[in-house]
Amino acid sequence: MKTAKGKDKVKTTKEALKPVDDRKVGKRKAPAEKPTKRETRKEKKAKKDPNKPKRAPSAFFVFLEDFRVTFKKENPNVKAVSAVGKAGGQKWKSMSQAEKAPYEEKAAKRKAEYEKQMDAYNKNLEEGSDESEKSRSEINDEDEASGEEELLEKEAAGDDEEEEEEEDDDDDDDEEED
């Protein structure tokens, strides 16, 4: 089929042969609702476990710990972290293997400690998964029940001990104010 050239020419394309209702002239699709990049990052990023052991530093970072102290003594006016890092990197590159050896030994010891801590941490996670079979509400109910029993036992033992403790606490407060 022929295509139209110019404004006044008749269109003989497939679009021209379709009825007007079927044409997508002037119609736009609504933009798809996609989550923003920030939202997807937040969803993908897993929450960090505060009980997980911190990863062992490399030999360079062990060196950098010592280097920071000496660099700050020699250059008290330089406060930029990047300057300390750059100077430390240059010094590390210029050091021989013999000079790096003590830092590599410290890093190896820390790595061994980290691996032991991770083994213990992973064992605790495995043991913790057994407890997850119970619902958390049942666990909380058991804790609350045992706490109530302890309170009842204390009250039965006598209120004299609690009163003495409160008096001792009041005396401590008076000393802090002076």
UniProtKB/Swiss-Prot annotation:
One of its GO terms (cellular component) is nucleus. Expressed in cotyledons, roots, stems, leaves and flowers (excluding pedicels). Residues 140-178 have a biased composition (Acidic residues). Residues 1-52, 101-118 have a biased composition (Basic and acidic residues). One of its GO terms (biological process) is chromatin organization. The modification Phosphoserine is found at S137, S146. InterPro entries: HMG_box_dom, HMG_box_dom_sf, HMGB_plant. Disruption phenotype: Slightly delayed and reduced germination rate. Reduced root length. Enhanced sensitivity to methyl methanesulfonate (MMS). It comes from the Eukaryota. Residues 1-59, 75-178 are annotated as: Disordered. Keywords: DNA-binding, Nucleus, Phosphoprotein. Induction: Down-regulated by salt stress. It is found in: Nucleus. Residues 53-122 bind DNA. GO terms for molecular function: chromatin binding; DNA binding; DNA-binding transcription factor activity; structural constituent of chromatin. PANTHER family: HIGH MOBILITY GROUP B PROTEIN 1 (PTHR46261:SF1), HIGH MOBILITY GROUP B PROTEIN 4-RELATED (PTHR46261). Binds preferentially double-stranded DNA. Modulates general plant growth and stress tolerance. Confers sensitivity to salt and genotoxic (methyl methanesulfonate, MMS) stresses. Belongs to the HMGB family. This is High mobility group B protein 1.
